[in-house]
Amino acid sequence: MNARPEKASSAGQADAPIRSGADYIESLRGRGLRVFLQGEFVTEPVDHPVIRPSINAVAETYDLAVRNPELATAVSPYTGERVNRFLHIAGSPGDLVMQNKMQRRLGQLTGTCFQRCVGMDAFNALHSVTWEIDAARGTGYHRRFIDFLAMAQRRNLVVGGAMTDASAPTERSAG
């Protein structure tokens, strides 16, 4: 459980949705994180020149949704509202085509990784897997997943994921 108090967004409410790239950037400030980069403590990660390009790329995912909602948003069956396509569960081949077009456009705009694809893919996988587990075992994972998804959609959060390579050399130390 996170012991830190939740930071209010620029709208002044902790649960207010992030509406733009500027809102996203502001939501990252003043979190009191202990960040070290190349052995040096970073006082405010948002302003660090090595970190900032990644932040700007994520911010563009919000701004594209504002500028081009047909491309970068979709109507959620869980909230009934338009949500960022990175938080949308693909329900048709058309959804997958639009995901690809959005990702292509973001690549053109940012020229870099925009940090949200793995989270989107994880959400889509979890949607299917939790339903299958519930069907086989009578558990409540899918409902809890849908509740979390709807909360993330309402607040327009970034959901991140990580890829690892299990075949990477393990004989070397991390240090």
Per-range role (PLM):
Residues 3-62:
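N-terminal-proximal low-complexity accessory segments that begin disordered
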Residues 57-75:
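Short, solvent-exposed cationic patches
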Residues 74-175:
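Glycine-rich flavin
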